[in-house]
Curated annotation (Swiss-Prot):
SMART domains: POLIIIAc
Cofactor descriptive note: Binds 3 Zn(2+) ions per subunit.
Organism placement in taxonomy: Bacteria, Pseudomonadati, Pseudomonadota, Gammaproteobacteria, Alteromonadales
Organism from which the protein derives: Shewanella sp. (strain W3-18-1)
Keywords, ordered alphabetically: Hydrolase, Metal-binding, Zinc
Disulfide topology: none
Cofactor dependency: Zn(2+)
Residues reported in the UniProt entry to bind Zn(2+) 2: H16, H41, H195
Entry protein name: Probable phosphatase Sputw3181_2734
Source species, domain of life: Bacteria
Any one GO cellular component localisation term in the record: cytosol
Length: 251
């Protein structure tokens, strides 16, 4: 199956990434990607874009040559209370909010602390997807996190980049996350975590993990634009309504 949705990408606005929105649109057309989210790192990261970058994402067109663009952020989990580095009404202007642990913002501690911080982030209602929860630098109680994510309707990401260029040793944790998600009915999503446009829609390693765990691919958020947009609308992102209408017209 061709997965046409990618929820996790970075542009040159995060200066350790190397592609523009235009680059992503070109690759999306080549690969048959119909919808992707631009989710640069939240402003607490040293090389992240300024706060205004995210406020001004509204200037991006909704769709270019049949490819939809979601205006988003990969925020940073800042502390054990699950606070993130984007807030208030500005969050409501975004289509999608991802959040995860990043060493420069919230250094690794211990399993209990990581678990509490992640669950508090899930409970906050501000975050739609937890990114790379299988990072071995941040061990968590996987069952507890999967149960909380299922209860609060938050998706857990199986991050393809974690098996290729970063977060080495994530395979066992991600397999356990996929198995727990199957058991507790947690929503999963595959994210390329692309830092260069050529990686857009690259899910091969993530899909292998999901297959090995026996997680039903029929429940993946990536399976169609309408599924992801419906998920985001249900979570209160009314900003996606116009994008939903454009995809409905294209059917």
């Amino acid at each position: 199956m061709q997965y046409q949705v990618d929820t996790h990408t970075h542009t040159v606005a995060s200066t350790h990434a190397y592609s523009t929105i235009h680059d992503y649109l070109a690759v999306a057309k080549q690969k048959g990607i119909r919808l992707f989210a631009t989710t640069d790192h939240g402003p607490a990261m040293a090389d992240a874009p300024h706060f205004w970058h995210f406020v001004n994402l509204r200037v991006l067109p909704r769709m270019v040559d049949g490819v939809g663009i979601l205006r988003g952020i990969e925020a940073n989990i800042k502390n054990i209370d699950g606070e993130i580095d984007f807030f208030g009404d500005y969050l409501k202007q975004l289509d999608i909010v991802l959040a995860g642990f990043h060493e420069p913002v919230y250094p690794p501690s211990d399993k209990a602390t990581h678990t509490e911080a992640m669950i508090n982030t899930i409970k906050s209602g501000k975050v739609d997807i937890i990114t790379h929860p299988g990072n071995p630098a941040y061990p968590i109680d996987i069952d507890a996190v999967a149960r909380a994510a299922a209860e609060y309707g938050v998706a857990l990401e199986i991050n393809n980049s974690s098996f290729e260029v970063s977060r080495k040793g994530s395979e066992a944790n991600c397999t356990a996350i996929a198995k727990a998600a199957k058991e507790f009915g947690t929503i999963l999503v595959m994210g390329s975590d692309s830092h260069v446009a050529f990686s857009l829609g690259g899910f091969e390693r993530a899909l292998a993990i999901i297959d090995a765990a026996g997680y039903p691919k029929s429940q993946l958020l990536n399976r169609s634009p309408s599924v992801l947009l419906g998920f985001l609308a249900q979570r209160g992102h009314h900003t996606v309504a116009d994008l939903q209408a454009l995809f409905d017209e294209a059917v």
